[in-house]
Amino acid sequence: MLVTKSKFQYYQNTFYKKLLATPYRIKLEIVTIQKVEPTEEFSMDAFVGDSPRTSEFYEFQALYEKEIPNRTREKYGLPKEVNGVVYLSPKQLVPALGYYHLDWNKTKVHFEGRIQVIDKIIYLEELYGSCVGVQIFVKDDLKGG
């Protein structure tokens, strides 16, 4: 059965309040790639993907799980390298970013001095142009940034 909009907003607000009550803070790094216009017919720099990048950082309170149960790993097909789950709310993301759908390929999570890359994003109960929460599965960035 479809959830009414008022019940959906109730769930969304309840989840958001839980996030605000947590002691954890994470930083999201959103990487923007500036397109390089080749000056010649073929440019090795543009081809290889060595375009200049800029990063913007946003800090949020978040729920963070350091251990992932085997059942969750099986359900979502997560590799063993995935070592954490971050939960955020669209009520945090939309005011800061203007959207809540994150590009996993251009977003990194900074938590407790570690840089983590996103392996998978699940939008929890996506209804009415929003969702209750954003579940982000992360793994350590072995490339170092």
Regions found by a protein language model. Name each.
Residues 1-8, 24-145:
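Short, conserved turn/kink motifs that form compact alpha/beta structural patches or helix kinks used as
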Residues 12-16:
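Intrinsically disordered, non-coiled, low-complexity regulatory regions enriched in serine, threonine
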